[in-house]
Amino acid sequence: MKDLVKFLKAQSKSNDDFDVIKIGLASPDKIRSWSFGEVKKPETINYRTFKPERDGLFCARIFGPVKDYECLCGKYKRLKHRGVICEKCGVEVTQTKVRRDRMGHIELACPVAHIWFLKSLPSRIGLILDMPLRDIERVLYFESYVVTEPGMTDLEKNQLLTEEQYLEAEERWGDEFDAKMGAEGIQVLLRDMDLEHQCEVMREELQETNSETKRKKITKRLKLLEAFQQSGNKPEWMVMTVLPVLPPDLRPLVPLDGGRFATSDLNDLYRRVINRNNRLKRLLGLVAPDIIVRNEKRMLQESVDALLDNGRRGRAITGSNKRPLKSLADMIKGKQGRFRQNLLGKRVDYSGRSVITVGPYLHLHQCGLPKKMALELFRPFIYSKLESRGIASTIKAAKKMVEREEPIVWDILAEVIREHPILLNRAPTLHRLGIQAFEPLLIEGKAIQLHPLVCAAFNADFDGDQMAVHVPLTLEAQLEARALMMSTNNVLSPASGDPIIVPSQDVVLGLYYMTRDKVNGKGEGMYFLDPREAEKAYRTGQVELHARVKVRITEYSKNEAGEFLAETNLVDTTIGRAILWMIAPKGMPFSVFNQTLGKKAISKLINESYRRLGLKESVVLADQIMYTGFAYAARSGVSVGIDDMVIPAQKNDIITAAEAEVAEIQEQFNSGLVTAGERYNKVIDIWAAANERVAKAMMENLSTEEMLNREGNPEKQASFNSIFMMADSGARGSAVQIRQLAGMRGLMARPDGSIIETPITANFREGLNVLQYFISTHGARKGLADTALKTANSGYLTRRLVDVAQDLVITEDDCGTHEGIVMTPLIEGGDVKEALRDRVLGRVVAEDVLKPGTEQILIPRNTLIDEKWCDVIDVESVDVIKVRSVVTCNTDFGVCAKCYGRDLARGHLINQGEAVGVIAAQSIGEPGTQLTMRTFHIGGAASAAAKESSIQVKNAGTIKLANAKFVTNKEGKIVLTSRNTELTVIDIFGRTKENYKVPYGAVLSKNDGAEVGVGEIVANWDPHTMPVISEVSGRIQFSDIVDGLTVARQTDDLTGLSSIVVQDVGERATAGKDLRPALRLVDAKGNDIFIPGTDVAAQYFLPGKAIVTLDDGAEIAVGEALARIPQESVGTKDITGGLPRVADLFEARKPKEAAILAEISGIVSFGKETKGKRRLVITPAEGEAFEEMIPKWRQLNVFEGEMVQRGDIISDGAETPHDILRLRGVHAVTDYIVNEVQEVYRLQGVKINDKHIEVIVRQMLRKAVITNAYDSEFLEGEQVEVARVKIANRKRAEEGKPLVEFERELLGITKASLATESFISAASFQETTRVLTEAAVAGKRDELRGLKENVIVGRLIPAGTGFAYHQARAKKRVVAEQPFEMPVSKNAFATEADIEAEFEFVADEATQNLAALLNATDEE
């Protein structure tokens, strides 16, 4: 019977159908129940017989037999004795693999505190006992006593006593009280805790206290105590009395040759613990002196600490070779730990790797696989085929045949491989296109052949790159490889929706060459019947490839019914273009081909083809384009020779002129007219300009040539210079590189980023001298160092992004929200950075879009905007659209398809189950290596020149001012008195064309609503000073302006004019500290004048450093400057660019000198100042005033008495995203992060869709802080998932209770990853110990919602094809949880068919077209 029970128990263990994983503290009884026996001896194995010692660390009796079905002494062997326990050696006869999961235990002679709960900050034991960590450690390591039971004495519970105090107390009170040392003391304290009572006490304290710090502390402790109460963990379990022993096969001892042993460090650590434990037992048995026992107990505590987490306290225990031993904690954390090494990344069988070479003759869906590799990889398939055909009688025979490589084997191999896709992967796999499926073609040789067009996706080249091959084994895997991962289904990039299968290099050059035209080419002006005739004429040498000719071209276009209509015209074109037209698919217009095709044009062409004709046609077209491009690149004979680098004749004159200018500046510097900084900046400007001029002359010379046309007149045409053609077509090289070859190399930077003022005047054709070469090496070396750093940093950013977004999946079709974000074209100054159509393409409209100026609905709500709608938007000149966004999506755990919009890689509305989080992370992380690492230092003069002082309009239109307050001066011009005014120019359709920020004090020549022409200057201001503008006219009266006290007089030596400068408070004498200098405006009678429309007297307080040039009593008109405040041009500002900037944004870091924003709307005034700060007070119309201390050195943008709105900038600087969220809301912070991240990528020319950044922002905004909890399960000030609060609120709304109030919180991506609901996911990311400790104490449950948790427990992920599986399981679970009495309907347990019907996955165009495509490509 017992065996049967055991057998059943073993069976039930393998059941992995669990839905949740819970982690908790193990009680001593639990540990004993896991154990199969106590480990009593530190011995491992007998070194002569190599058999494990009895009761030792490898004991066979406890952990199971060493050999399968054989006891240790050899009495029972074979399967027939299964389950017998040998009476001689006590070993159960069973499989040896039980040694991997049977645990043992050690009974500790005294309790030992678990180091994780002691030292992992915040210390859980310290928090629960409310004692400082230092005190607890002193108790644990036997330095002082702790009072556990004060009795009737005047000692406190938890009080520490030194040795002397203890003896004194003992003399005084005898055994009235109880005090203990070591872990026993702590254990007693923990055991005596009354959690419920404590919780009540804390809640009362929480109500009474007012101090913020105290509240925080109490909340923390309260949460911990409640967690203990709810989870069923007992606090005393944080102190261990029994230690579990890991199964021996997980800490192996392997004999090496030469009689030595390799062992896991854990064995050493366990041996230490057992030795000390046994010694302590002996000492206790002998009743040894206290001091000796104490020392032994301390050593036991230390050795258990080392076993659990070596090095966390004190020095790490080292092994024989001086390196610290690897403890249990080290086994699971870090890159080499269990999580990241074995659970998230495994090695795979049926795989191989080899070098890649070009396969220019392959189809897009094929790759060349060396026969040798194929034979290895497809072995099992070959065996089964050989056997089923009866060619080999047994598997063994088949194996022999394959090893001998008999001819029949190769035939079988070819059969097996046919239409069996394989996966190719190139490391680093930065995005999902780094693994794609191909059909293998068997080839001779040892290198894998790769189709050239997929190189861009893999980022591969053929300079020795290697790729790995994997074989999908099961039918499902093959199906997924074929339908989802085939290279023909990955034409579009998931990051931007543009084609990624785009020709580059040779192909581009070939197409460019064949579509160029030439003046007076051979055969110009001939007429051809059709492209075939033209090709014949070219092949027979009658015409040149570039000759301009007329050809009859037949174009096909689709009508409404989808039939093709033919239309034939005689078209002006060239022979090359006519030949290229022969490969064009039906339905493409000839105009796309009838132009000189550069790289951009070809990309457009493929995109156009995809949108018009679908996937299959585009793939065939791409292949054809590639073959043609290669062929004509070979014919062109384009090569690089030294004579192609033509140096412009004007070069010497330009350089001589520049040298003369530099000499002149040097003269001025020597005579002291300019400063060193100015001289340096001017010299650099001169050389930069000279470089530009040389480059311009060179390009003019290179890019055009003059030919005689048929009439004999000169005509200009684009040059046929090889180097120019390569750069112009986009095949290789750029204008910058040509400039270095044939112009001049120009200015070089030092490693720190500053520019060396002597440029390299030579170019590579002339050659560099030693000094020039030396200067060049600076930049080159810095570039290499940069690249190395960049790769690591970019990889780490991607890892953090993936971790924060990994559990975001499309879980439903429509969440029904009306929320969204408002999209307008991105306009900066006079340039449209991104048009509206590009921003809304592939999004779903959140509210009906009306036709501008009418009530007519143009685009109804919930429409997916595609290219056709975009054209409508352009035609109707729509300017603003509210689209749905991931950030505003209402789905609880996941996102809905409508809020996400189009699946960029497929071109239709996204499917359910798509893992959008991971796609977003990959799309942002993948271009990371292209971003720069540098911080730009901009010198003083360089940035001074960049300061604008006027606005010149580029488009005609109407002016519109936003948040503007102004006065009109006596010339009738407008003077602004508001801070963040925006000036926009609007065209006749009402579309915004330009957008400018105008500062305070700017003089505008046009008012709101005025018309402006092209090139008009509408605003002027002085960039170096900020004026104080008078809003009324009157007479000036000085107030508190006292010479020598608050102001100082200055007289200009040249002009003799005197001015008053207000002194900073810090510089004034004591008497002037409280005076507040101001200018008041009075009328002739001396009465105060009020600012129009208010009851505020017109008086202007002057800040420090303000300069007043007017005298007391002077007359002043409206809009004139009363005083000027010099703006310190801040010296060198570091602009963080590139990768670090992106990381800062996603980590939501506060910038060094953040902008200060107004917390509330109201009137500004200044309170009493302290030593280094001034007090800013904002008084609202009603309610409390808000005070803030601001450092003196910050320049403020507001004057006393000014009205500010909540969220206005009070002091300039970089804005903190946290402030934006708090003061302006979720939309504003989304906008801010999206635009700032895009700014960095745009500079590098990388295109990423906004959606991806929004997905990450959604994950950063996952948490909320409860502001008013009412009677809910939340605590005030607690941080919880927004989804949890929403769910709770829905429930409360139904019950009619008040809703829980909360504020959204922005977390950086690292923080957000660690704060996920899933502890498994967080633990495998970073800070494993801390995460697991926290989770165990709280008894957390992991619902296994995200992708990562499911990968770790070894399941299908709840995304993609695994989505349906998880949905079906959830359904089954719901059915299973229904009460049993009711009759179970026949389809309560859904059949496979039901499930499939439930999730009728919309088969992609890709899947449908696949069979057709494969047949088509074979026939051609």
Curated annotation (Swiss-Prot):
Family of this protein: Belongs to the RNA polymerase beta' chain family.
Protein's UniProt name: DNA-directed RNA polymerase subunit beta'
Main enzyme class: transferase
Record organism: Haemophilus ducreyi (strain 35000HP / ATCC 700724)
GO terms classed as biological process: DNA-templated transcription
GO MF: DNA binding; DNA-directed RNA polymerase activity; magnesium ion binding; zinc ion binding
SMART domains linked: RPOLA_N
Catalytic activity: RNA(n) + a ribonucleoside 5'-triphosphate = RNA(n+1) + diphosphate
